């Protein structure tokens, strides 16, 4: 069974305080998903979901996302074994973003680079230019081995 979502109410108070989950997908049919570790709160990734991905996530308890670059649905961790079990989903005040608190199986890594989080670099300024510096270079798995042939 695939869940369907009602259109968001016109009444702002109903949208912000009513009991119905009525996600506000953007013009491309997507909603932003912020993903953190349910255990320690670390920010793991930011992704997008279409209605099908959100529905599958709610129905199965496993995180599904929509890849804009590949133009397809994907179950997070299906290739790597690092499945995300959803412990809680929250939505923001105007229901145009969701927050998933997850437990990560396998190597406890979320990023395709093998790192725990996709946010492994800091941004700063050096010599008048914006630069990035790697602050977490620990890889929980070797992407070349995990994704060979993909």
Curated annotation (Swiss-Prot):
Enzyme class: hydrolase
Cofactor binding annotation: Binds 1 Mg(2+) ion per subunit.
GO process terms (BP): L-histidine biosynthetic process
Reactions listed under catalytic activity: 1-(5-phospho-beta-D-ribosyl)-5'-AMP + H2O = 1-(5-phospho-beta-D-ribosyl)-5-[(5-phospho-beta-D-ribosylamino)methylideneamino]imidazole-4-carboxamide
A GO molecular function held by the record: zinc ion binding
Localization: Cytoplasm
Keywords: Amino-acid biosynthesis, Cytoplasm, Histidine biosynthesis, Hydrolase, Magnesium, Metal-binding, Zinc
Pathway participation: Amino-acid biosynthesis; L-histidine biosynthesis; L-histidine from 5-phospho-alpha-D-ribose 1-diphosphate: step 3/9
Enzyme Commission code: 3.5.4.19
Subunit structure comment from the entry: Homodimer.
Protein family: Belongs to the PRA-CH family.
NCBIfam families: PRK00051.1
HAMAP family given in the database record: HisI (MF_01021)
Protein name stated in the entry: Phosphoribosyl-AMP cyclohydrolase
């Amino acid at each position: 069974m695939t869940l369907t979502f009602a259109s968001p109410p016109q009444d702002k108070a109903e949208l912000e305080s009513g009991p119905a989950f009525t996600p506000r997908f953007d013009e491309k049919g997507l909603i932003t998903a912020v993903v953190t570790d349910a255990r320690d709160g670390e920010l793991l990734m930011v992704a997008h979901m279409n209605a099908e991905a959100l529905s599958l996530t709610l129905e199965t308890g496993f995180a599904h996302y929509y890849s804009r670059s590949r133009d397809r649905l994907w179950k997070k961790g299906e290739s790597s074994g690092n499945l995300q079990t959803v412990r809680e989903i929250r939505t923001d005040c105007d229901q145009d973003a969701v927050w998933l608190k997850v437990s990560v199986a396998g190597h406890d890594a979320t990023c395709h680079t093998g790192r725990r989080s996709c946010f492994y670099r800091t941004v700063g300024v050096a010599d008048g230019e914006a630069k990035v510096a790697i602050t977490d270079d620990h890889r929980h798995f070797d992407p070349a081995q995990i994704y060979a042939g993909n």
